[in-house]
Amino acid sequence: MYQSIYETEFAARPSYDALPESRNVDVAIIGGGLTGISAALTLAEAGFTTVVLEAGQIGAGGSGRNGGHVCQGWPNDFFHISRQLSPEDADIAWDAGMAAVDLMTTRIETHKIDCEPHFGYLHAALHKRHMAELDAMQAEWEARSYAHFTRLKGQSDLDAHIGSTAYVGGLYDTGCGHIQPLKYLHGLAGAAMRAGAQIYENSPVSRIERGAPKQLHVAGGHTIKARIVMLCGNAYLADVGLPQMTHRLAEVVSSVLATKPLSENLARQILPTGAAVADCNTALNYYRIDGSRRMIFGGRSSYSKINFTNVTPNMRRRMAAVFPLLEDVEIEQVWSGKIGITVNRIPHFGRTVDDIYFVQGFSGHGVALSGQAGRMLADAVIGDATQFDVMRKLNHQIFPGGPLRTPALALGMAWYKLRDYLRL
């Protein structure tokens, strides 16, 4: 259930040893996803001795099994950020979000990472309210000099990019796109290792002993002593997450489907320009055609702790509703796993007085943004905390409900799904 198509096709992916011995470092990073590996690369390039401790395998979490969508900016409307900040700080926050895709593309080129990058993204509107939301987004972004949007007014415009009649219009965005995320992550890890970072798999941290230095107790009886610690595990930090983190993050189970490779003709009928697509619903569908011409379709999330073991029928129905031509296509793989969300869907940045840094809650928007967040954490340690300090000014609410917060979240999302269905 947890193995993605990326793992299946990337059989020769690198592996890393478990931590073999105790050692002293400048920075210890818990979590070998895009955030942690990005931070490690930036720190190693600046000359910091850095170790990454991954409890399982690199890419076993959301960084290695997501839908592969590369998106600009922050997950929610920028208004939710700018209203809490001065105009000067809002500009810094905007620039930080917009740096994410540029950072990714620069690293792909610099380190020659083979991860199937493709640019072109369709924000698809299911009804008039969605088009109004996209029009507002276009106006806001273009007021800040974003120049990658083309408004699609109806079916004739849509036909150039998508073979579906499910939508009334959309925004085509040449500044976003898609990649094979596991290949990108391992390419980034290789670059971090070459820069001098140490990466260890199967090295879970059971406890952080505060002090100077901090001591991380790792499986196998080893200890890492570090001046600075970064918590980059997002939804996978149950044993070592800080109280100010855990109450501001909710775990959501997200699912993705991969079809068998489509014929060249069928793939071209469905997505003629190869763009990635996401609709504007709260419980959205998102999809793309990968480098092997598989349809990679996401759109089934669980906001409760009920364990659903077979999401394939639901995922197939959702895909066929958009593309009737795929109703009978053979499914190769379906997988699920946890992601972390915040109340406002904006990532939560923080730092303790004794230099434990963290970021969490990319809310399904982390393929590019998590790498940028990792660089922001690293930059703060290196000496430029400008972007990091602005983002940690944002207020992040505690999820309501206390011990009942999971059913409360599920109930709230049921309302949003009904709202999507009724097109309210």
Label the predicted regions.
Residues 45-65:
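Glycine-rich FAD pyrophosphate-binding loop
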Residues 297, 301, 305-307, 312-421:
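C-terminal catalytic lobe of FAD-dependent flavoproteins
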Residues 65-95:
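Glycine-rich active-site loop/strand segments that organize a redox cofactor
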Residues 25-52:
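N-terminal Rossmann-like FAD-binding beta1-loop-alpha1 element of flavoenzymes
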Residues 1-27:
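Extreme N-terminal leader/targeting segments of oxidoreductases
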Residues 102, 110-118, 205-207, 213, ...:
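Active-site substrate-recognition segment that forms the wall
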Residues 1-9, 76-82, 106-120, 124-187:
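Flavin (FAD/FMN) cofactor-binding and adjacent substrate-gating region
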